[in-house]
């Protein structure tokens, strides 16, 4: 499972002209399920994401997590993160989880996130979304948890 997280001053998702999710300062997270991912990978990725120290403390060091700062988390489904770009000029999405599996894992991830953190907003799985954000830094990290084979 993949999470591309960006520290933001604010972020929002619009679907069909309506804002479906928005946060102030926090993390905007593009989330992707890969083939073979299960709730185990989702749990591990969520634990890492919520405790990942990307916010500055009083000394200016990245020592605080989104939980420590009570920041928002905007979770946006993004299957293209699993693209295989090694060959040619058209990406292959074979590494991405099947849509029904990906939807179930995204919904599970959101449910678990809401049980562990107060400020969770989401995009809409399968929708054409317009995502807006103001990067803070910019600070961007790629987190990935692979199934143990």
Swiss-Prot record:
Main location as per UniProt: cytoplasm
Protein name: D-aminoacyl-tRNA deacylase
Source organism: Janthinobacterium sp. (strain Marseille) (Minibacterium massiliensis)
Keywords from the named record: Cytoplasm, Hydrolase, RNA-binding, tRNA-binding
Entry remark concerning the domains of this protein: A Gly-cisPro motif from one monomer fits into the active site of the other monomer to allow specific chiral rejection of L-amino acids.
Top-level taxonomic group: Bacteria
Motif Gly-cisPro motif, important for rejection of L-amino acids per UniProt: ranges: 137-138
Quaternary state and interactors: Homodimer.
Record-level GO cellular component terms: cytoplasm
InterPro entries in the record: Daa-tRNA_deacyls_DTD, DTD-like_sf
Catalysis performed (reactions): glycyl-tRNA(Ala) + H2O = tRNA(Ala) + glycine + H(+); a D-aminoacyl-tRNA + H2O = a tRNA + a D-alpha-amino acid + H(+)
Subcellular location: Cytoplasm
Function: An aminoacyl-tRNA editing enzyme that deacylates mischarged D-aminoacyl-tRNAs. Also deacylates mischarged glycyl-tRNA(Ala), protecting cells against glycine mischarging by AlaRS. Acts via tRNA-based rather than protein-based catalysis; rejects L-amino acids rather than detecting D-amino acids in the active site. By recycling D-aminoacyl-tRNA to D-amino acids and free tRNA molecules, this enzyme counteracts the toxicity associated with the formation of D-aminoacyl-tRNA entities in vivo and helps enforce protein L-homochirality.
Keyword tRNA-binding appears in the UniProt entry: yes
Similarity annotation: Belongs to the DTD family.
GO molecular function terms attached to this record: D-tyrosyl-tRNA(Tyr) deacylase activity; Gly-tRNA(Ala) deacylase activity; Ser(Gly)-tRNA(Ala) hydrolase activity; tRNA binding
Pfam families reported in the protein's UniProt record: Tyr_Deacylase (PF02580)
One BP annotation, GO: D-amino acid catabolic process
Annotated EC: 3.1.1.96
Alphabetized NCBIfam families for the sequence: D-aminoacyl-tRNA deacylase (TIGR00256)
